[in-house]
Regions:
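C-terminal outer-membrane beta-barrel translocator/porin domains of Gram-negative envelope proteins
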Residues: 1-162
Length: 163
């Protein structure tokens, strides 16, 4: 069916080093960036039933001295028979000290409503965790707090010399 989308990406980027990788420069979008999408499904357009699919994302970041502060939010789902189905919404807030050593902190929370049977919010590698027993959660929501101290132990020059 018909699709209506809007996306805004602010032309505000900074170049940082020591955020996700030690020795490379990265472009970080400061935003605010967001996108919204709605798709209408209807038998008139070849769909099997009437429903409205929706999705949206938002992102903002800022730099305060050596700290990079990040925020993200998102939602997706569908409206069908007057109710929300397969609805997932979440928020993530993070902070990282830039440079060769520093703290990285992340708080993520995600919830759902009437998930389809083939969808689950897992505590797996997609959000940085491994080895969690599935008996500890029902797959309808998740929350995660990461706090880590990072320090570069040795630095390489041209992949030949380490110091």
């Amino acid at each position: 069916g018909p699709r209506l989308s809007y996306e805004q990406i602010a032309d505000r980027f900074i170049v940082v080093e020591g955020f996700r990788a030690w020795a490379v420069q990265e472009d970080v979008s400061l935003g605010p960036n967001f996108s919204l999408t709605a798709i209408v499904s209807d038998p008139t357009f070849g769909g099997d039933s009437r429903r409205l699919l929706v999705a949206g994302r938002g992102h903002a970041a800022g730099r305060r001295g050596r700290w990079l502060l990040l925020g993200d939010t998102w939602f997706s789902g569908r409206l069908e028979d007057g109710a929300a189905h397969n609805l997932v919404a979440g928020i993530q807030i993070g902070a990282a000290q830039l440079g060769l050593k520093g703290w990285q902190i992340r708080l993520l929370a995600e919830g759902s409503r009437r998930l389809d049977r083939d969808r689950q919010l897992t505590l797996g590698a997609d959000i940085g965790l491994r080895g969690w027993d599935p008996n500890y959660y029902d797959g309808t929501g998740r929350a995660l707090l990461n706090v880590q101290w990072r320090k570069l132990l040795k630095k390489e020059v041209l992949g030949l010399f380490s110091f």
